[in-house]
């Protein structure tokens, strides 16, 4: 009876065969990129030809070292190993190395980085710096032993002796060259005594010149405070450093000429021209001054010099008169001021104040006496009037005149409305009192 395998068992067997097959451990494969969408980490896509498709994976660390970006439809050559993914039973190739098919990877990387930096604006003319007319010290980032530095020194010395050349010895090709170039550009920018920077190397293949296409070098040039001249390779060679630099020179000699736009002979010719212009200007000024002196010597002032100061003498006389008048007015004003101040001092004297206060006190004393007499008389009259009013209210005086006073419970009855039938009342009379009982109450019509 046949034994049936599980799917897992079969898949594990196939995976083992794939893993141990020497032909699948290192596969050289060519195909077209399909279903590619760039991810921030690992890259997953397909490789296909006209009749088949295989899934492909590039781990993040490998992809970052490719030097170019994959694109949909790009044909590439890859080296990798084939493996089986057990959960789905599918197989794929794990890519360890890749390069474009046909066109070199460096050319693609060049165009991709150029496009990226162009979109960022690094190559725009508005960022270009003007080169100085007169540089006292020029920095050069290049190889110590190459012909570049010799050509630059020779050309600068010939065109303008006295300009200092400061070399930053740099590896210009191979591994680590780009980092060293960028580092020396940054070092040069730390100095305050440099006016200009030249970076370059001699000719070579695209691989030899590649360090000057690296992003780290391009950004270092863009961020440079110093103006930068790029002189990389021959006239037909073009690097990204040329695009971002402030000026591009086809040769080291041309770079040195750009760095010294004004030569020693130009300066001498300029000085000679300036000397001629100065001599001409001095002669013209001297001639004009001589002509002016001649005219002055023929003027009335020179023939009759006293007329020069006649007006000033008249002005002096007028000022003297005005000064005397001003002094008289000032003295008169001051006298009046002294008199006014003297009068004020007299008024402010303690003796004067005391006399004034004594006079005022006498007046107030007399006024107080008269006012007190008036108040006293008024109070006496008021007391007499009140006394008479009190006498009029005395009950003994009322009954003495024949009147009687009616009281109810010790209260004086002043109206029949306060009484009612059978109330007990007391009748006060001149010689005694009578106890009565009210028999009837009659109200008098008014």
Curated annotation (Swiss-Prot):
Keyword Cell inner membrane found: no
Class of enzymatic activity (EC top level): hydrolase
Catalytic reaction list: Exonucleolytic cleavage in either 5'- to 3'- or 3'- to 5'-direction to yield nucleoside 5'-phosphates
Any one GO molecular-function label of the UniProt entry: nucleic acid binding
Subcellular location: Cytoplasm
Matching CDD domains: ExoVII_LU_OBF
An example Gene Ontology CC term for this record: exodeoxyribonuclease VII complex
GO BP field: DNA catabolic process
Pfam families: Exonuc_VII_L, tRNA_anti_2
Keywords: Cytoplasm, Exonuclease, Hydrolase, Nuclease
Enzyme nomenclature, EC number: 3.1.11.6
Function according to Swiss-Prot or TrEMBL: Bidirectionally degrades single-stranded DNA into large acid-insoluble oligonucleotides, which are then degraded further into small acid-soluble oligonucleotides.
Subunit relationships: Heterooligomer composed of large and small subunits.
Protein family membership: Belongs to the XseA family.
Protein name: Exodeoxyribonuclease 7 large subunit
Species the sequence originates in: Streptococcus pneumoniae serotype 4 (strain ATCC BAA-334 / TIGR4)
Lineage: Bacteria, Bacillati, Bacillota, Bacilli, Lactobacillales
């Amino acid at each position: 009876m046949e034994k049936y395998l599980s799917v897992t068992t079969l898949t594990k067997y196939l995976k083992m065969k794939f893993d141990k097959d020497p032909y699948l451990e290192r596969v050289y494969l060519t195909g077209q990129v399909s279903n590619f969408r760039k991810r921030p980490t690992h890259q997953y896509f397909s490789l296909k030809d006209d009749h088949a498709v295989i899934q492909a994976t590039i781990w993040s660390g490998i992809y970052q070292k490719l030097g170019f970006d994959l694109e949909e439809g790009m044909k590439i050559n890859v080296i990798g190993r084939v493996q089986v993914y057990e959960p789905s039973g599918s197989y794929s190739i794990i890519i360890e190395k890749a390069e474009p098919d046909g066109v070199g990877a460096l050319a693609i990387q060049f165009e991709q980085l150029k496009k990226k930096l162009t979109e960022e604006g690094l190559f725009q003319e508005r960022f270009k710096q003007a080169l100085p007319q007169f540089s006292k010290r020029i920095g050069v980032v290049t190889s110590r032993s190459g012909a570049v530095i010799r050509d630059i020194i020779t050309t600068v010395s010939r065109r303008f002796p006295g300009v200092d050349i400061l070399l930053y010895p740099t590896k210009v090709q191979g591994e680590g060259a780009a980092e060293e170039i960028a580092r020396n550009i940054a070092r040069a920018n730390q100095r305050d005594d440099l006016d200009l920077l030249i970076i370059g190397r001699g000719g070579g293949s695209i691989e030899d010149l590649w360090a000057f296409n690296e992003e780290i070098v391009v950004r270092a040039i863009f961020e440079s405070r110093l103006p930068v001249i790029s002189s990389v390779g021959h006239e037909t060679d073009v690097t990204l450093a040329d695009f971002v630099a402030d000026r591009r020179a086809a040769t080291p000699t041309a770079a040195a000429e750009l760095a010294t736009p004004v030569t020693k002979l130009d300066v001498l010719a300029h000085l000679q021209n300036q000397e001629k212009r100065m001599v001409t200007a001095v002669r013209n000024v001297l001639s004009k001054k001589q002509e002016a002196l001649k005219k002055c010597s023929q003027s009335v002032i020179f023939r009759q010099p006293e007329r020069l100061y006649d007006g000033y003498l008249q002005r002096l006389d007028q000022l003297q008169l005005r000064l005397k008048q001003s002094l008289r007015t000032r003295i008169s004003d001051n006298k009046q001021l002294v008199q006014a101040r003297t009068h004020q001092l007299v008024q402010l004297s303690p003796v004067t104040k005391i006399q004034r206060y004594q006079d005022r006190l006498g007046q107030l004393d007399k006024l107080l006496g008269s006012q007190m007499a008036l108040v006293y008389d008024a109070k006496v009259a008021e007391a007499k009037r009140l006394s008479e009013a009190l006498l009029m209210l005395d009950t003994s005086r009322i009954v003495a005149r024949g009147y009687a006073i009616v009281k109810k419970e010790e209260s004086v009855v002043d109206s029949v409305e306060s009484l009612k039938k059978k109330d007990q009342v007391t009748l006060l009379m001149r010689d005694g009192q009578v106890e009565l009982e009210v028999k009837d109450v009659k109200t008098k019509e008014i």
